[in-house]
């Protein structure tokens, strides 16, 4: 592949397996070692002199472990733990020290309780500051990257320009998209990973670390990470639009439900009011009916007593009549 321009320069790719010659090449297309360090690493690589499982101190789950580099030599285990615990629960932490002097070697390993916590630190802690030094964070390549050769044997990744032994393909220094034709056959003979023509990543994308096989969520996450920033933005807008649509429908449904419940309560209240009014009316009729009966009965009783009184007075002689009768009786005597 050939190309040019800024668009090509800004396109990168990352190594998924380690090869010393490729690691020494800025675009991953070298077919011969260009410095003594690469030659030494190639010798170890071909002879199988490095065994990543031979480090007795490399314990723990590699899928939950991060490499932390470029630490200050004054940074302690406590300081490293305090900073890295912001991203999750730390299960184990090891600051690598010189076997004789005990001085810090400037790097360490942090194991988290879960892969999710490790990923959070992998994404957020990279290029953060600890004791005034900008650190680098990467996955545990020692145990997870096929063919890995460490820095002390001429391999590794990254490095500083002043050292004269830069290594490419890692998170800090990815391979650039080649500006020259790719020697496909030569690379295949050496067993070197070919550049992913047409599938380069941008520098703003974060390369995904190795994940356990068989996880659907891992495949989805890798697919998402490999998308361009434009595709991710479009997908984000689409998901946001769908969430907004469903939220609007849910809100409308909730509002409609509230209105129906409110209407039902109003109708129920009206029914209860009508029922209450009828009950009160019947109660008042009953009470007034009883009072009317009592009043009517009282009136009838009074009229009956008056009638009886008149009848008695009618049958009894009057006082004047009695006196006349008495006088007449005495006169006759």
UniProtKB/Swiss-Prot annotation:
Part of the U11 snRNP, a component of the minor U12-type spliceosome. U11 and U12 snRNPs exist not only as monoparticles but also as a preformed U11/U12 di-snRNP complex. Interacts with CYP95, SCL28, SCL30, SCL30A, SCL33, SC35, SR30, SR34, RS31, RS40, RSZ21 and RS2Z33. Residues 154-333 are annotated as: Disordered. This is U11/U12 small nuclear ribonucleoprotein 35 kDa protein. Pfam families: RRM_1 (PF00076). May facilitate 5' splice site recognition in the minor spliceosome. May be involved in interactions with components of the major spliceosome bound to the pyrimidine tract of an upstream U2-type intron. Gene3D superfamilies: 3.30.70.330. Residues 159-175, 215-241, 263-293 have a biased composition (Basic and acidic residues). The keyword Phosphoprotein applies. It comes from Arabidopsis thaliana. One of its GO terms (cellular component) is spliceosomal complex. Residues 64-142 form the RRM domain. The gene is SNRNP35. Ubiquitous.
